[in-house]
Amino acid sequence: MKALDALNILSDLMASQRGLVTTARAEAVGVDRHALSRLERNGHIERVMSSVYRSCAAPSFREERVYAAWLALDRAVPAWERARDESDVVASRGTAAWLMELGELNPEPITFTSVERRQSARPGLRLVKASLVRGEIVQVSGIPTTSPERTVLDPLRDGEDESLVSNVLRDFLRDNPDSVVSNVREKVDEVATRCGHPAGYPLFEALLREAQL
């Protein structure tokens, strides 16, 4: 297959996925691995991570590695179709906080939560099995992501340093109305014992003090 023909075939698909395409999706539309290798050698596409390429005509973007990892976890299915799948993986923990610019949690390893047990041998990738409901999922730059409320709670449940979580909470409070904050206050206090505090400990207020609010 000629390079121009391969690029023409891939152009619409890549345009719908922020300039990215997986090897599996390329093969599904008739562009095999040899054609992809030629396109890469000739400077038409660039490898973002194993099995994921970006068009060199498309700009790189801040969330690129997270988006590429999300595509790679179900690499045969186009992004637009996955957006309707409630069982799909969802960016979570530090990765979700980083996507939403909440606090200073480390986004690595790139972390996704799924209601089903999933595994991946990809380095730098973490998959967590946990319950999720529709209201706990939002879209951030085209990536399914845990809601800000859930993103505050998950690090606490994981035993993350409370000083780091307090900064996530600080930025959450900046962007949310009092009605939402009241609900989060209750849920934060409910996990206090899991964080090693006695029953009834006002964890929400303690985090506010830590964040100097």
Where in this protein do the model-derived segments appear?
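Short gly/ser-rich loop at a beta-strand->alpha-helix junction or flexible surface loop bordering the NTP-binding
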Residues: 2-8, 15-147, 151-154, 158-186, ...
